[in-house]
Each structure stands twice: as C-alpha cells, then as structure tokens.
UniProtKB/Swiss-Prot annotation:
Active site residues per record: 205, 341
Gene designation: eno
Protein name: Enolase
Textual note on the cofactor: Binds a second Mg(2+) ion via substrate during catalysis.
The protein's required cofactors: Mg(2+)
Keyword flag Cytoplasm: yes
This protein's record includes keyword S-adenosyl-L-methionine: no
Subcellular location field: Cytoplasm; Secreted; Cell surface
Its job: Catalyzes the reversible conversion of 2-phosphoglycerate (2-PG) into phosphoenolpyruvate (PEP). It is essential for the degradation of carbohydrates via glycolysis.
Catalyses which reaction(s): (2R)-2-phosphoglycerate = phosphoenolpyruvate + H2O
Gene Ontology BP, a term: glycolytic process
Length: 433
C-alpha cells in the first residue's frame, strides 16, 4: 500500500544561511521521501507566498516555524491515509486546504515541501528514480545547463545592474561533456579576472562578482570561452537574466534605472530593447530573461514580435510559473519561453501543468533553481522528467549548485545510450518559418 502514514516538517538552513522548510513523508509500505524547499532573493510580485515568522528575535524575522507547524498539524492531518501515488489529488487537497490564490494560508513553502516529499516517496514505493516516476518511459532528454558565471543585480555587491550572465554549452555531445566545458570556461574566467586584478569571490549562485561595467561582463565571458579552447556562438553561447523589475522605477522619472552603475541613467522600454538589440548584434546571446518589468505586457509583446525569431525571451517574474499568467502571455504573444520555479507556484502538479501548457503553445521551458538553495537536487530530475531541454542551476562552485549537476550526470549514466543531449536544438521551435 502507498498510503501516507507520517509527515514531519522541520526548519533547516538554505545556502544563504536563511531558514527554510524540510519535509519527510513515510508510506504504509515503508517507502520514504524527503524534500527541501528553495527560496529566492529577487521575487516576482505575483509569486505564491512564502510563510515567514516575522519574529525579529529569531533569524531576523525569517524563521519558518509557522510553516513547519502547518506541515505538522493541518497538512499532516488532512493527508493522513491519502494515496501518495496520486500526485494530482494530493496537490489538489493541498490547494483546497489552503483556499487562497497565493497560498498565503498554509504558505507555499509548507505546501511545496509536502508535495515534493510525497513525489519522492511515491517514486520510492514503485522502485523508480524520480525522473522516471514524474516523466514516464519517454523521459530521456538531458537539459543544456544555463550556468551563471558572472553575478550582478541583487545577487552581488558590485556595480553590474543585470542579475545573471550565463553560458550554455550547446556544442557538447552530452550533459557530462557540457558540464566539463562549463567548468573549463568558469576556471578560465577566474584566471582572467585574477590577472586583471579583480576579486574572484563568488555570489549567491556561485558566479563571480567582479566590480565591472555591464558590457564588460560580456567581454570577459567571450575571452574566457576562447581561453578555454571553445568557439563563442558554436560551442558555447550566452544567456542573460536582467531581472528588470528590480531596475524599474515607477516614480516621477518612470523607467529602468541603472541604480548600481549609473544612477542618473533611466531608459524606457524601447530604449531597453534597443540596448538588447545592440548586444545581440555583437555577442552570441541566445536567451534573455525578464528583459522588462513584470507588468509591461505591451512591452513584452512588442519585444517578442521584434526579437522572438532571434532569441529566447524568458518570462520569470513575468509569468511566475502561473498558468493564468502564461495563458495570457500566449494569447498576447508575450515572450516565447517560461522559467519554471517550483516555489513560485507551490506544488509539483501546478509546476508540471505550467510546463505542459508552455510546450503545447510552442514555448520553451527552463527549469530553475533559486538563489537560496539546498542540497536537494529535485529540479535535476524534474528537468529530465519534463524534457524541457534547459536547466538553470547556478555556476561551477558551491555544493548547493553542484548537487544538481552531479545528479544530472548520474541520470545520464543510468540512461546510457538512450540519453539524448538537447544542445542547440532546444531553441529550434523558436525560429519562425
């Protein structure tokens, strides 16, 4: 039997030293699952709500004992005896129990911890790896890493305004080789930065955080790709996460304020798009995430019309893994890709629904970590299960990021000759005929 007989939540720490929720689930056949919930630094306005204690005497108000209590009382009682093999029903029970649009009653962190742990317990009950349980027999595509090697924005204390400068090893034959290529570029970049007198300390997601200009970050990445022995645009391409909602100033001088590098500089949406056009013409940039503010539907539709057949335009804060917002984006032609973060929506089933909706509409989907991570590698299995072809899970440092890469290599080894690496083909459906 796969009935739930035991659920326990606890407070643990994430990679930034902030509290987060861990949940354990045991089934009547002694199967077991455990999951840890990630947390973001720059969060979208429309994300599901994390429940925090607000008690300034503990962890500066960031404790999660209230969320843990919800797991151990209300949720545990509701799910007692429920069939763990019916993930959709389990998640529906959680959604109904919460009863709010943004998961504010139970907390998305409490709900997600339970949802993920139940999925792991169910996979254990069937004797299946998590990716096979969630994805079925056809889950064999390995994702291309989107590795953050230079940090800016709210992820660092330097003067780079945009949050993430990433590389993607699209020319690799396998995930293992792609990870090797990424690591080699990462170490080449470190050598270059060190020789030019820059600090090589790393940010929240393991990338370097040198105190350089926005465009200089691209120049350094190009040099690092070449120093590692690869060809920019063929072997390795560049992706950006601008996190532009963090730059948007809705005050008297409405626009995008480059508050770290040039506080007096404010661009409107058209000028932001012109900046990206210039960069795309000079650098092998294939993907830009959150290039505009999360409420600028008109701007996103216009940018997608102009650039959507050249690059991947990814909605993160714009879509927040929410099918309602995604459906509107599809209808209005805004973006051509969605970033997928489990804790933005709060359950495994809703996450899967968002990916399937995107794929059906011809959008790509990128499975993503958060800046506050743990050793949990659930998203590695999820990326393979849903055959998204892309995963964004940090740089080649910090064990909380490396845990995901190591899990991907294990999965590829397990799949053997059946494993397929997405490579540049992951962008094929974006090219309009």
């Amino acid at each position: 039997m796969s009935d739930i007989i035991y659920i326990e939540g606890r407070e643990i720490l994430d990679s930034r030293g902030n509290p987060t929720v861990e949940v354990e689930v045991q089934l009547s056949d002694f199967s077991y699952g455990r999951a840890c919930v990630p947390s973001g630094a720059s969060t979208g306005e429309y994300e599901a709500l994390e429940m925090r204690d607000g008690d300034k005497s503990r962890y500066m108000g960031k404790g999660v004992l209230k969320a843990v209590d919800q797991v151990n009382t209300v949720i545990a009682e509701e799910l007692d005896g429920a069939d763990a093999l019916d993930q959709a029903e389990i998640d529906n029970m959680l959604i109904n129990l919460d009863g709010t649009e943004n998961k504010s009653k139970l907390g998305a962190n409490a709900m997600l911890g339970v949802s993920m742990a139940v999925a792991r317990a169910a996979a254990d009950s069937l004797g299946l790896p998590l990716y096979r349980y969630l994805g079925g027999v056809h889950a064999m595509q390995m994702p291309v890493p989107m590795a953050n090697i230079i940090n800016g924005g709210r992820h660092s204390d330097n003067k780079i305004d945009f949050q993430e400068y990433m590389i993607m090893p699209v020319g690799a034959p396998s995930i293992r080789e792609g990870i090797r290529m990424t690591a080699e570029v990462f170490h080449a970049l470190k050598d270059i930065l060190k020789k030019e007198g820059h600090v090589t300390a790393v940010g929240d997601e393991g990338g370097f955080a040198p105190n350089i200009e926005n465009v200089q970050a691209l120049d350094y990445i190009m040099k690092a790709i070449e120093k590692a022995g690869y060809k920019p645009g063929k072997d390795v391409v560049i992706a950006l996460d601008c996190a532009s909602s963090e730059l948007f100033d809705a005050g008297d001088r409405k626009g995008y304020k480059f508050w770290k590098s040039e506080p007096s500089k404010i661009l409107n949406a058209d000028e932001m798009v012109d900046l990206f056009k210039d960069w795309i013409s000079k650098y092998p940039i294939v993907s830009i995430e959150d290039p505009l503010d999360q409420n600028d539907w008109e701007g996103y539709a216009k940018m997608t019309k102009e650039l959507g057949n050249q690059i991947q335009i990814v909605g993160d804060d714009f879509f927040v893994t929410n099918t309602k917002r995604l459906a509107r984006g599809i209808e209005e032609g805004a973006c051509n890709s969605i970033l997928i973060k489990l804790n933005q929506i709060g359950t495994v089933t809703e996450t899967i629904d968002a990916v399937r909706m995107a794929q059906k509409a011809g959008y790509t989907a990128v499975i993503s970590h958060r800046s506050g991570e743990t050793e949990d590698a659930f998203i590695a299995d999820l990326a393979v299960a849903l055959e998204t072809g892309q995963i964004k899970t940090g740089s080649m440092s910090r064990s909380d990021r490396i845990a995901k890469y190591n899990q991907l290599m294990r999965i590829e080894d397990e799949l053997g000759y059946n494993a397929r690496y997405a490579g540049m083909a992951t962008f094929a459906n974006l090219i309009k005929k």
